[in-house]
Swiss-Prot record:
Functional summary from the UniProt entry: Functions as a PqqA binding protein and presents PqqA to PqqE, in the pyrroloquinoline quinone (PQQ) biosynthetic pathway.
Keywords: PQQ biosynthesis
Identification of the protein by name: PqqA binding protein
GO biological process: pyrroloquinoline quinone biosynthetic process
Family recorded in the similarity comment: Belongs to the PqqD family.
Species the sequence originates in: Xanthomonas euvesicatoria pv. vesicatoria (strain 85-10)
GO molecular function, one term: quinone binding
Length: 92
């Protein structure tokens, strides 16, 4: 993992934006010269990357919203965040 913890407060890097792609009818992260398609779960997490909320806070919000296990959601949020960070789409 690349130093991501439950206390990390990620945001989209400059030049990366969350956008609905009408041609694909799918939400994507649009970055210079590439597009990353998001599934429904990745979308609800990515919508919360604002640079102010920690991953623990995001996980707690999602656990409450979806009535799910907070520990499992936190692990999944950290894993997704690590993947997107490795693709250079996020800053911490």
């Amino acid at each position: 993992m690349s130093g991501i913890t439950r206390h990390s407060q990620p945001s989209l890097r400059a030049g990366v934006r969350l956008q609905h792609d009408r041609a694909r009818d799918q939400w994507v992260l649009l970055a210079p010269e590439r597009v990353v398609e998001l599934d429904d779960i990745a979308l609800v997490v990515a919508q919360r990357y604002d640079g102010t909320r920690s991953l623990a806070q995001i996980a707690q919000e999602l656990a409450a919203e979806f009535d799910a296990d907070a520990a499992q959601i936190e692990a999944d949020v950290i894993e997704l965040t690590d993947t997107l960070h490795q693709k250079r789409l996020l800053r911490l």
